[in-house]
């Protein structure tokens, strides 16, 4: 049987391999099936294959597609984590693994740029990220507005603002990372079906049964990393989830373009009184990328997402550029939409299905999950194999009473 997913162009769909699924229906039993091959799913697929498990991954589109939450050319990794200090050890280990993955990848996966966080007086983001950094003894450099403007002249912020720089931050290339994990997992013996949607997951006495287009696959365990499609597959999740439409834009700098290049501009978060933004330097001619991190317009479901960015969406991002990065407020290069799958408290959801512990659920990363993919892959592989995870995940439970305190408000 042929492995799929080797060196896939970012926008090339792969047809489902019907001969493979036909064989599965007749004779194949898997140790684990992974549903959804985005950030967490691709890393889990790789990790299980590395361990020698009989693993199958099923992706309804293709690895690196633009219809979910694992695309957009770049993702931030930052260690000074305002969301909660408990993420920092996970991030430190994830970063080490991203560096290792980059060394073995034909495509660039990770670039160190440092990360800078900037905010208005009293911004919760600044206070909590500093607290997390100090607790975990991260290298961090605090700055007043004058130093921010001098060191990173792309920013023109008010005199009473403050910020800090953390040198270990950087940008990840999501499509390349997903392809790398899929490629490596397939080379280790993992199987992949693309262009095929899982219709049902059924619990049986001796196995879990999946239906795909009228055919059935049996497995000892399932990992559902389906992002915004999670509740379509596992309906008894008690934690309410909200899917939101998010828009990102790429811009050609108006003046002094070298100030916006990777090496001059780090990846950044900026907390303004009326919004919170994130962005990336110009890397390989992509332009300055920026977006709001505040959850956007709710969607009725995952299939409601369209690549339909509007002039109004552009205006929202230009508000950042006009006020705080005026030299970057040049011609629009392109815009793109994606989805956040949000929990009420802004933290992840990692747990077992209430009705069947053989079904592991991991999704709802609330817009900040991609950077954790290498660690999520190990955690989910452990859970799928009925092992105790190497990293603690109790704070990400579907039980609201066990979860971490809510992520601090950004505005």
Where are these regions (language model features)?
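Dinucleotide-binding Rossmann-like beta1-alpha1 core, especially the glycine-rich loop
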Residues: 74-151, 160-161, 276
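Helical element adjacent to the flavin cofactor pocket in flavoenzyme catalytic cores
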Residues: 167-220
């Amino acid at each position: 049987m042929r492995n799929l997913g080797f060196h896939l162009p970012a926008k090339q769909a792969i047809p489902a391999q019907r001969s493979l699924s036909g064989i599965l229906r007749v004779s194949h039993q898997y140790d684990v099936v992974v549903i959804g091959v985005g950030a967490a799913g691709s890393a889990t697929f790789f990790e299980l294959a590395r361990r020698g498990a009989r693993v199958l991954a099923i992706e309804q589109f293709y690895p690196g597609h633009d219809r979910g939450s694992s695309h957009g050319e770049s993702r931030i990794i930052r260690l000074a984590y305002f969301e909660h200090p408990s993420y920092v050890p996970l991030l430190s280990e994830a970063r080490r693994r991203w560096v290792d993955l980059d060394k073995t990848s034909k495509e660039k996966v990770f670039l160190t740029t440092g990360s800078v966080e900037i905010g208005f007086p009293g911004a919760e983001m600044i206070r909590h990220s500093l607290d997390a950094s100090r607790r975990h003894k991260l290298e961090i450099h605090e700055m007043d507005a004058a130093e921010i403007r001098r060191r990173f002249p792309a920013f023109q912020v008010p005199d009473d603002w403050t910020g800090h720089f953390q040198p270990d931050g950087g940008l990840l290339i999501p499509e390349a990372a997903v392809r790398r994990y899929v490629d490596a997992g397939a080379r280790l013996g993992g199987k992949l079906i693309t262009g095929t949607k899982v219709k049902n997951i059924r619990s049986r006495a001796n196995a879990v049964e999946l239906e795909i287009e009228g055919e059935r696959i049996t497995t000892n365990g399932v990992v559902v990393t389906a992002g915004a499609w999670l509740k379509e597959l596992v309906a008894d999740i008690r934690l309410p989830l909200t899917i939101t439409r998010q828009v990102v834009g790429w811009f050609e700098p108006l003046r002094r373009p070298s100030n916006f290049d990777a090496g001059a501009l780090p990846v950044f978060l900026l907390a303004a009184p009326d919004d919170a933004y994130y962005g990336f330097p110009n890397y390989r001619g992509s332009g300055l990328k920026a977006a709001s991190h505040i959850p956007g317009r709710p969607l009725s479901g995952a299939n409601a997402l369209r690549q339909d960015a509007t002039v109004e969406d552009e205006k929202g991002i230009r508000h950042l550029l006009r006020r705080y990065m005026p030299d970057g407020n040049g011609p629009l290069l392109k815009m793109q939409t994606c989805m956040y799958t949000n929990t009420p408290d802004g933290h992840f959801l990692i747990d077992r299905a209430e009705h069947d512990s053989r079904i592991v659920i991991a999704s709802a990363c609330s817009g900040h999950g991609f950077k954790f993919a290498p660690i999520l892959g190990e955690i989910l592989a452990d859970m799928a194999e009925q092992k105790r995870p190497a990293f603690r995940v109790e704070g990400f439970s579907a039980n609201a009473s066990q979860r971490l305190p809510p992520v601090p408000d950004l505005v």
